[in-house]
Amino acid sequence: MAVVVSNANAPAFEAKMTVYVFICVMIAAVGGLIFGYDIGISGGVSAMDDFLKEFFPAVWERKKHVHENNYCKYDNQFLQLFTSSLYLAALVASFVASATCSKLGRRPTMQFASIFFLIGVGLTAGAVNLVMLIIGRLFLGFGVGFGNQAVPLFLSEIAPAQLRGGLNIVFQLMVTIGILIANIVNYFTATVHPYGWRIALGGAGIPAVILLFGSLLIIETPTSLIERNKNEEGKEALRKIRGVDDINDEYESIVHACDIASQVKDPYRKLLKPASRPPFIIGMLLQLFQQFTGINAIMFYAPVLFQTVGFGSDAALLSAVITGSINVLATFVGIYLVDRTGRRFLLLQSSVHMLICQLIIGIILAKDLGVTGTLGRPQALVVVIFVCVYVMGFAWSWGPLGWLIPSETFPLETRSAGFAVAVSCNMFFTFVIAQAFLSMLCGMRSGIFFFFSGWIIVMGLFAFFFIPETKGIAIDDMRESVWKPHWFWKRYMLPEDDHHDIEKRNA
């Protein structure tokens, strides 16, 4: 399939969607599958009695008591740390991964990620005490930090610009598939006593092995090769992934971008310059907003949440499987729409969509779920339905676009550093939500859904006023085509920086 990459201000680069690029995309995106599996598995394991008896006996005792506060049964800081420690480690690892991405390349960084994943899987599945369990989660976090740094950059840099949105969302698609697989594994291993939780935690080893050996088959990105002065290799790589002979214009554009990037000795300091503020601010706030939609609170703790509203253990795990299935299907919708309707439309539509769902869930719980007892069956089913509809809206918008937009808007000279900051922000806010959600649920009860509703209003307004459309724009032409025409961000495009654009046009 051939496409011509063009926009009003950018050159046109001919490219084909080759089989080889598709294979590279699918192998790299396995990193997203592991991330999704780790998101989904922790909530289901946290609801398993064998796991709770082994590591969190106080929570297990509370869970058995019918008259225990519905909203507080699982409120335990160490139980929350089991989930959240992964994201704390990922936060730190993403900065190290930024350096390896720049110095060694995107492919070796993915290989490091797979090794960390395998170590983490061994420690968590074989854990004999809480310390060993948490250390294993930390190693998984190192893998997440390296994988989430390298994979979206890799996908953005090998994709033709007109297909970049859809191909980049494959990462988020694999995250959702990982969550679904984890939910299915949780459902079946919950009945395997007393070591079902070990099987569930050990399952992440399979995609980690696939990523480790699959990464040996994929090509390094042309941008990464040229950035490290391997110009001839970069040119051959570009010809291979584009599937056309005439790649000289795009090659020269990448070389020029790399020349400019090489003049930046401190990319993190460069991020603080006025011209870097638009992608920097948007990249950070997208990570904040993505987490404060409340999505990971639901995905982490879906089985726990469904037990809270009255489902039994098996029914709660099955409901999580249904939610995960909706998540996957809706992500396919996002892949189809993102390069057709654009990024802004999806962000704005889903903000209204998710707000309505959160309000309805909050109202039902406030009205019908007391401190003890359970919801009636009809109300519980309505909650599950609106959780699914809510997940649907997130899956085709803020989920994938929270990764896509930062990966495509930073210029090359700050791309690795800027995306490292974005990944770190994502991991930090994910850590905050994972560590605090069960305590917030205990303290705020149904009010937690109104809390997230308030955040959805804020992020919808931010998207309306401050996030420009980037559909179809070449990745190294964002400054000229996106930021300079924007009503607000153009104030940061100072005249002294215009030599960048003049040199680029001359090249």
From Swiss-Prot:
Membrane topology: Multi-pass membrane protein
Tissue expression profile of the protein: Pollen specific.
Annotated GO biological process: carbohydrate transmembrane transport
Taxonomic source organism: Arabidopsis thaliana
Cytoplasmic face residues: 1-20, 468-507
Activity regulation details: Inhibited by uncouplers such as 2,4-dinitrophenol and carbonyl cyanide-m-chlorophenyl-hydrazone.
GO cellular component assignments: membrane
InterPro entries (UniProt xref): MFS_dom, MFS_STP/MST-like_plant, MFS_sugar_transport-like, MFS_trans_sf, STP/PLT_plant, Sugar/inositol_transpt, Sugar_transporter_CS
Protein name: Sugar transport protein 6
Compartments in which it is found: Membrane
Family, as annotated: Belongs to the major facilitator superfamily. Sugar transporter (TC 2.A.1.1) family.
Record gene name: STP6
Entry GO MF terms: monosaccharide transmembrane transporter activity; symporter activity
